[in-house]
């Protein structure tokens, strides 16, 4: 395996491990805020997607095409799960309870639309578009509490902004030394995931 593919695979696996750890720590959290469950789903979705993408990177040209395609489709679906979890968590922590059912219905509809077209998705762009459209909504929902100095919201807004930097690096194609733009994207995204985790850790009933 070329060095570039090896590093990309390892950083994918690092994201998977990090996300699994975060999900496990949140699951063990006593007296969890209802929004925490959505973020656990989000971290699990990211973990599965990263694991499948890393395996996909390492298996190109080595496994039957049908297996490669299955890995790809699994990754696309897992990112949809991550998007759903993030949005569910954001709604439960920011939207007034009288509106939460309507907001959750909108999230389910968005996810169903994405899943219905996921089988035809042959590039990473559609998954990234869904994932980061979810992040944009998360940002909008947390801006006001962040400005009001709610610690959890400030961490989550920070996570979205760091993710935006990661996307910018990915799009730029910047590849210093032996690292590719994909590797940098993964490393920066790990910082964003840590921000999300810290924010979710601090959820209170008042968030």
PLM-predicted stretches and their roles:
Residues 1-46, 54-75, 80-207:
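Polytopic alpha-helical membrane-helix bundles and their juxtamembrane interface segments
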Residues 51:
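Conserved phosphate-interacting/catalytic interface
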């Amino acid at each position: 395996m070329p060095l570039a593919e090896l590093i990309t695979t390892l950083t994918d696996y690092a994201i998977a491990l990090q996300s699994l750890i975060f999900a496990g720590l949140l699951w063990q959290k006593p007296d969890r805020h209802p929004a925490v469950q959505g973020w656990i789903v989000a971290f699990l979705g990211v973990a599965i997607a990263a694991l499948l993408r890393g395996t996909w990177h390492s298996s190109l040209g080595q496994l039957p095409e049908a297996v490669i395609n299955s890995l790809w489709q699994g990754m696309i679906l897992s990112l949809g799960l991550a998007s759903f979890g993030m949005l569910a968590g954001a709604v439960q922590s920011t939207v007034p309870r009288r509106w939460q059912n309507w907001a959750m219905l909108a999230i389910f509809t968005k996810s169903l639309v994405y899943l219905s077209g996921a089988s035809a998705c042959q590039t990473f762009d559609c998954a990234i578009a869904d994932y980061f459209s979810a992040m944009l909504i998360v940002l909008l929902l947390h801006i006001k509490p962040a400005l009001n100095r709610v610690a959890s919201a400030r961490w989550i807004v920070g996570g979205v902004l760091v993710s935006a930097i990661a996307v910018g690096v990915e799009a730029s194609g910047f590849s210093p030394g032996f690292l590719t733009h994909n590797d940098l994207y993964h490393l920066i995204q790990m910082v964003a995931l840590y921000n999300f985790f810290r924010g979710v850790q601090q959820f209170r009933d008042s968030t």
